[in-house]
């Protein structure tokens, strides 16, 4: 979908910045990156994979378009686990808009879009988007602006 939006709108920011499809389940600033990694490693070591239903398309105006999963029990639980794992780490400040019950799960597929590019992005999705399911198989830790992967954890297979 990121590629389709880029091709239709002409805005290639997501591709140029190498931002992979993802849902942000916690946002924070810290000076204790190693401690965050260790806390998340412990918290996620027994976490199983789960299924999400992607049901809609939305926008953060004026220039972001996203696809939206249904906030089910599994996704809420992941949000709680990650946020609770890092909330008490010194010199770590959680971003309020990514905390449980204050968060809109989404996967950005177009960013820094002009008004015309936003219209074209919606047109691309109108032609191609339909409700679908996908599995959560990995949790990653990344820096933003520019995007940089820091760590990732493969989740346990169900069963």
Write out the residue ranges for each language-model feature:
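Basic, often amphipathic N-terminal segments
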Residues: 1-51, 74-133, 150-159
């Amino acid at each position: 979908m990121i590629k389709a939006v880029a091709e239709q709108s002409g805005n290639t920011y997501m591709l140029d910045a190498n931002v992979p499809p993802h849902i942000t389940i916690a946002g924070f600033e810290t000076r204790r990156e190693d401690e965050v990694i260790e806390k998340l490693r412990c918290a996620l070591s027994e976490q199983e994979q789960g299924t999400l239903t992607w049901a809609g398309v939305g926008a953060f105006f004026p220039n972001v378009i996203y696809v939206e999963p249904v906030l089910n029990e599994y996704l809420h639980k992941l949000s709680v686990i990650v946020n609770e794992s890092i909330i008490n780490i010194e010199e770590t400040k959680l971003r309020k808009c990514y905390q449980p019950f204050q968060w809109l799960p989404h996967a950005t597929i177009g960013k820094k879009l002009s008004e015309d590019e936003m219209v074209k992005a919606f047109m691309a999705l109108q032609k191609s988007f339909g409700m679908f399911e996908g599995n959560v198989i990995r949790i990653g830790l990344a820096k933003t602006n520019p995007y940089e992967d820091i760590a990732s954890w493969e989740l346990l297979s169900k069963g």
